[in-house]
Amino acid sequence: MAVSPKINRREHILQCLAQMLETSPGQRITTAKLASEVGVSEAALYRHFPSKARMFEGLIEFIEESLLSRINIIMDDEKDTMKRCQLMLQLLLIFAERNPGISRVLNGDALLGENERLRSRISSLFAKIETQLKQILREKTLREGRGFNLDEAILANLLLAFAEGRIAQFVRSEFKLKPTTHFDEQWRFIQHQLLQS
């Protein structure tokens, strides 16, 4: 029974951190401000997380688990190359839109001035997603008997850059310009261009 309140407090701390990232764009989150938001002392924060970097790592773990588990579901459920790519990009954009504070972590904006390993971890997550996109595009030849005229690594990079750009616009607009705005039309255009290559 003693473990449950600790888990709930940890989750509450992370939720407050994400909320502060959303409501205080451009501002650095200090442990003093976070403790005040959570309603505990700084010492109480450190009982649950040994450092602020560990708090951000908790958010990054949530991001990784959420995105990578859903990407695995897409891979299991969908076999069409273009549909897989569409669903993966849509997943990234919807996730960012539903979690504005966390989109600042995805974008790297919230990690400025923080431990380098946090930025490396986000970079690693995007590298995994890009690798998955590249693999999907390469499998098109095997699955559908026809590949692309452009290298799949270049195409995967283009697709991910599109999603990252939409997330960056969302953060830069202080969450007013939704990442999913016009996605369907944009995807139709992107897909048409990819299939022409």
UniProtKB/Swiss-Prot annotation:
State what protein this is by name.
Answer: Nucleoid occlusion factor SlmA
Residue ranges annotated as coiled coil are: 110-130
Query: Domain HTH tetR-type spans what residues?
Result: 7-67
**Keywords on this record?**
Cell cycle, Cell division, Coiled coil, Cytoplasm, DNA-binding
NCBIfam families to which the protein is assigned, alphabetical: PRK09480.1 (NF007015)
Q: Which residues cross the membrane?
A: none
Q: Which GO molecular function, any one, fits this protein according to its record?
A: sequence-specific DNA binding
Q: Where in the cell is it found?
A: Cytoplasm, Nucleoid
Q: What does this protein do?
A: Required for nucleoid occlusion (NO) phenomenon, which prevents Z-ring formation and cell division over the nucleoid. Acts as a DNA-associated cell division inhibitor that binds simultaneously chromosomal DNA and FtsZ, and disrupts the assembly of FtsZ polymers. SlmA-DNA-binding sequences (SBS) are dispersed on non-Ter regions of the chromosome, preventing FtsZ polymerization at these regions.
Q: Name one GO biological process term.
A: negative regulation of division septum assembly
Q: What organism does the UniProt record list as the source? A: Shewanella sp. (strain W3-18-1)
In which family does this protein belong, per the annotation? Belongs to the nucleoid occlusion factor SlmA family.
Q: What interactions and quaternary structure are annotated?
A: Homodimer. Interacts with FtsZ.
Source gene? Answer: slmA
- Superkingdom as given in the UniProt entry: Bacteria
Output the SUPFAM superfamilies linked to this UniProt entry: Homeodomain-like
Which regions of the protein are recorded as binding DNA?
30-49
Identify one Gene Ontology CC term for this UniProt entry. Answer: cytoplasm
Chief subcellular location: cytoplasm
